[in-house]
């Protein structure tokens, strides 16, 4: 039974692009959007994973190789989606990287910082720019970014990563203000710790991660998953959130409330 069997399909007829859609939060969102009736374009640089996911989901799913730091590729991604499906209703700018273990400002490397900002912040900017370009004539659309709970609580991530995600939240708020007159909404999902990628398939790592999150998390008896983040993105993308814009939706089980 798929996730949309008990309720109406909330994205029926919509066209969505998901950057970083080949794995992790992106892949979970691609699957959920597809379950809810959307035509989804997976954009990523992980070609094997992206093509495999598209093949598994089948109808109304396609994959396009896209490096979000390259504006020509982002422009081509959006234009190809319009050519194939007639428009873009939802841009989920999810592509991003992390620093690994928390990096101190004393150990920060300029090249690594520029790469981090290039993918996490500039990539989001370019995705939004070209999505807005094709959404504006239709006077509707939805842009969603993956930010982070580190935008609400200090000290849980390295300074470079925090800077990139604060930048995304600032960008989102600026776009919510500017694009409102064009009928375009902009929001963020900001998850707490989520285990994704290769590590998620390793039982030992998974148990260690779940133990850590159970210890430090505020909401007991529950660990945040990529599927949980996908459900938040689904809400923001759906007509149920038709008057929701400028929101940083933090998924942290109340951690930021008790650790201000």
From Swiss-Prot:
Q: Which domain of life is it from?
A: Eukaryota
Q: What is its EC number?
A: 1.1.1.198
Please describe what this protein does.
Involved in the biosynthesis of monoterpene natural products related to camphor. Catalayzes the oxidation of (+)-borneol to (+)-camphor. Shows absolute selectivity towards (+)-borneol. Catalyzes the oxidation of (+)-isoborneol to (-)-camphor. Shows absolute selectivity towards (+)-isoborneol.
| PROSITE patterns linked | ADH_SHORT (PS00061)
For this entry, the protein name equals: (+)-borneol dehydrogenase 1
Q: What is the lineage of its organism?
A: Eukaryota, Viridiplantae, Streptophyta, Embryophyta, Tracheophyta
Give the reaction(s) catalysed: (1R,2S,4R)-borneol + NAD(+) = (1R,4R)-camphor + NADH + H(+)
Q: Which InterPro entries match?
A: NAD(P)-bd_dom_sf, Sc_DH/Rdtase_CS, SDR_fam
Q: Which organism is it from?
A: Salvia officinalis
Q: Which residues bind NAD(+)?
A: 20-26, 44, 67-68, 94-96, 161, 165, 196
> A GO molecular function for this record?
(+)-borneol dehydrogenase activity
């Amino acid at each position: 039974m798929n996730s949309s069997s008990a309720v109406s399909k909330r994205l029926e007829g919509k066209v969505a692009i998901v950057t970083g859609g080949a794995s992790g939060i992106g892949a979970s969102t691609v699957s959920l959007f597809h379950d809810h009736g959307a035509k989804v374009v997976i954009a990523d640089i992980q070609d094997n994973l992206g093509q495999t996911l598209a093949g598994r989901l089948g109808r109304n799913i396609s994959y396009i190789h896209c490096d979000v730091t390259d504006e020509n590729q982002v422009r081509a991604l959006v234009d190809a989606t319009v050519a194939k499906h007639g428009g873009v209703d939802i841009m989920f700018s999810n592509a991003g990287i992390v620093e690994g273990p928390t990096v101190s400002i004393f150990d920060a490397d300029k090249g690594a910082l520029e790469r981090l900002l290039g993918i996490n912040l500039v990539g989001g900017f370019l995705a939004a720019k070209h999505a807005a370009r094709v959404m504006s004539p239709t006077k509707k659309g939805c842009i969603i970014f993956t930010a982070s709970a580190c935008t609400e609580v200090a000290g849980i991530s390295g300074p470079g990563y925090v800077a990139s995600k604060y930048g995304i939240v600032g960008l989102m708020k600026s776009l919510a203000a500017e694009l409102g007159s064009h009928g375009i909404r902009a929001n963020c999902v900001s998850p707490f710790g989520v285990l994704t990628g290769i590590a998620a398939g390793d039982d030992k790592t998974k148990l260690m991660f779940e133990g850590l999150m159970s210890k430090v998390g505020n909401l007991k008896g529950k660990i945040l998953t990529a599927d949980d983040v996908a459900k938040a993105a689904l809400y923001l993308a759906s007509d149920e959130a038709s008057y929701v814009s400028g929101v940083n939706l933090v998924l942290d089980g109340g951690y930021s409330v008790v650790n201000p």
